[in-house]
Structure formats: structure tokens, C-alpha cells
Amino acid sequence: MARIAGIDLPRDKRIVIGLTYIYGIGNTTAEKVLAEAGVSEDVRVRDLSPEDEDKVRAAVDKLNLTLEGDLRREVSLNIKGLQEIASYRGIRHRRGLPVRGQHTKNNARTRKGPARAIAGKKK
């Protein structure tokens, strides 16, 4: 099992998909990493040679990406900063409501959580 940036990549997937299991690497970045490393996107993780693994690790380091714990910390600090300055976005985060302008009259159940029954309200 290949271990890159502290994450075990799934053995049965193609390397381009396996890299997306690392927080902070999506499809486009995974393709850039593999192009930098000179490794084919179609190779399965289990078929990677140790040299190819080292090339991919070096390419991830060379691209100077913020990944995993550092990226999660950065995002949470950004949200915390928005809350501290009491911006509109920070208030929406604090209240657990949609941040990006979605309507909340009918939907937004993902952000608001399960519906709560209101006493005395009938159809």
C-alpha cells in the first residue's frame, strides 16, 4: 500500500484517483502531480514501483501544496476569523445556516439539521 503525505492510498484504484484521497488534492492537482513525476495516470496503486512512489512523493513536495492537517487548520482558522469579525458569512457559520446565499424558507436541511416539530402547528 502506497503511503503519500501520511495517507494510505487504496491499492485497487488508479493512481490519479488514489491521490484524490489526500485532503487538498483533487482531480486537476492529481494530474499535475503525475505529470510532474512522469508517471502514467492509468497505473494502479498496487502496480507502482518503489521508484515511482518516490517520484510521486517528490512531485507532491515540489508543488508546495498545503495538505491534510495544515489545510484543515487553515480552513477552520479562516472560518473562525470570519466569526470573530462578525461578518455576514461568519454569522451564518455560527448559526449553522447556508453561507453562500441559498434560500432557507423551504430547504437547507443539510445545514439546519433534521426538522423540529412545532407545538400546535397543523396542516
Swiss-Prot record:
GO terms for biological process: translation. InterPro entries: Rbsml_uS13_C, Ribosomal_uS13, Ribosomal_uS13-like_H2TH, Ribosomal_uS13_bac-type, Ribosomal_uS13_CS. One of its GO terms (molecular function) is tRNA binding. Residues 94-123 are annotated as: Disordered. The keyword Ribonucleoprotein applies. Keywords: Ribonucleoprotein, Ribosomal protein, RNA-binding, rRNA-binding, tRNA-binding. GO terms for cellular component: cytosol; small ribosomal subunit. HAMAP family: Ribosomal_uS13 (MF_01315). Located at the top of the head of the 30S subunit, it contacts several helices of the 16S rRNA. In the 70S ribosome it contacts the 23S rRNA (bridge B1a) and protein L5 of the 50S subunit (bridge B1b), connecting the 2 subunits; these bridges are implicated in subunit movement. Contacts the tRNAs in the A and P-sites. Belongs to the universal ribosomal protein uS13 family. Part of the 30S ribosomal subunit. Forms a loose heterodimer with protein S19. Forms two bridges to the 50S subunit in the 70S ribosome. This is Small ribosomal subunit protein uS13. The lineage of its organism: Bacteria, Bacillati, Bacillota, Bacilli, Lactobacillales.
